[in-house]
Amino acid sequence: DLTAAFNPSGEDAKAVLPLLLNALYLLANSGKNLELIKCVFELRLLCVLGFSPVLDECASCGNVDALPFFSPQAGGAVCRSCSAPDACIITENTLDAMRYAKEASDKKAFSFTLPPSAIDAFARCTEKMCEAELSRHLSSLSYLKQMTGKL
């Protein structure tokens, strides 16, 4: 549903297909945490389509010291001073995982684990960013949350 909502074409579609196939393979065969696979897929899809979040400095002011929030409106991690109403609280562990998922090679992007609380924070960030870029809520996300008990 997410891939179709972004409707990639041309070169974007060529880059999205291997990402989608890899994620589907992992969902079906790997035994990895399904929520983490979804998070990594969402983040990498955003990057492929040109919506790459800023994760190494404050997306608003450029501060590199502490980035305890993620703001889809600002376009990535933000410092305490630039925190906006849409911002999610994130830990350094979650931010490091997001950086890794964004920068790693296709073969390595899904090859890490996180504690459940960090996965939940990662999911909040990627879901909000996808919705911000699409300017709408995905009904399939609500269904998935209902099925997994995360509503």
Give the location of each predicted region.
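Non-catalytic alpha-helical scaffolds and adjoining flexible linkers that form interface surfaces
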Residues: 1-151
